[in-house]
Amino acid sequence: MKKIAVLTSGGDSPGMNAAVRAVVRTAIYNEIEVYGVYHGYQGLLNDDIHKLELGSVGDTIQRGGTFLYSARCPEFKEQEVRKVAIENLRKRGIEGLVVIGGDGSYRGAQRISEECKEIQTIGIPGTIDNDINGTDFTIGFDTALNTIIGLVDKIRDTASSHARTFIIEAMGRDCGDLALWAGLSVGAETIVVPEVKTDIKEIADKIEQGIKRGKKHSIVLVAEGCMTAQDCQKELSQYINVDNRVSVLGHVQRGGSPTGADRVLASRLGGYAVDLLMQGETAKGVGIKNNKIVATSFDEIFDGKDHKFDYSLYELANKLSI
């Protein structure tokens, strides 16, 4: 292994820079040249590929986002388009590609490894949604979780001041982990997630029971993959008449300096990705399972169901929110 490349793809997440840094420095430590692909798979097509040095990743571990930039590239699903990308790697003698991103990013990496045996590919899970099989946690999840906690804590201050119910929408796509973990952490009265059937009347009854016991305000935390906060508000109004407001947290959840947990995870996964390439491994995603760094084939990741919603945590949150 003489030359490798690294790119970030899909939605950005805090800790991506730390992962790139780990890839670059582990490779250079092992006398491997490293190239950065700017703007994700689009950069592969546009030949936006540049050599990275030790200094290229200096002062990046604490930065959110990705200095390599990211972009959606739906045309990468077409084989003729991928041929251009593969040729741009081959002409530089690049033998390994590390892809940091989510499920779609992994699928692009798998296609490259299938269509060009000369290029090994390894995926690193970078997304705030925590929705990738083969790992307990994705890079960016912990930072986004802490961002949500900070925001909801502030919203609770104003909710209590005005005796209001706030319906707050968190990101997560089709995975309820962010809403679940944040909801437990902030003491939300109700958590609405895609993994659990939503009964709006039950939510209304719970809020009403709280009011009867003297509660002055409530927090309803909604995962975007289940319903919008506005829809939740509209349906709730059919069963209960309380002063309420909607707050959609939005893209602020993707930003910010990564937490220590995300920096450590990104560093461990980035270093291990290079180790795997040096061992001749390909078409695998790295992850953390039971605090151990592991590698799982892309096929297993796409077919697997090992990243399960924690129903016991959901039940605990329900018990504690009475």
Swiss-Prot record:
Domain of life: Bacteria
EC number: 2.7.1.11
Cofactor names: Mg(2+)
Primary subcellular site in the record, as a coarse category: cytoplasm
Chain residues that bind substrate: 127-129, 164, 171-173, 224, 245, 251-254
UniProt keyword annotation of ATP-binding present: yes
Cellular component terms per the entry's GO annotation: 6-phosphofructokinase complex
Pathway, per record: Carbohydrate degradation; glycolysis; D-glyceraldehyde 3-phosphate and glycerone phosphate from D-glucose: step 3/4
Keywords from the UniProt entry: Allosteric enzyme, ATP-binding, Cytoplasm, Glycolysis, Kinase, Magnesium, Metal-binding, Nucleotide-binding, Transferase
Catalyzed reactions per annotation: beta-D-fructose 6-phosphate + ATP = beta-D-fructose 1,6-bisphosphate + ADP + H(+)
Residues that bind ADP: 21-25, 156, 187-189, 213, 215-217
Functional description taken from the UniProt entry: Catalyzes the phosphorylation of D-fructose 6-phosphate to fructose 1,6-bisphosphate by ATP, the first committing step of glycolysis.
Family: Belongs to the phosphofructokinase type A (PFKA) family. ATP-dependent PFK group I subfamily. Prokaryotic clade 'B1' sub-subfamily.
Subunit: Homotetramer. Homodimer, inactive form. Component of a possible RNA degradosome complex composed of cshA, eno, pfkA, pnp, rnjA, rnjB, rnpA and rny. Interacts specifically with RNA helicase CshA.
Name of this chain's protein: ATP-dependent 6-phosphofructokinase
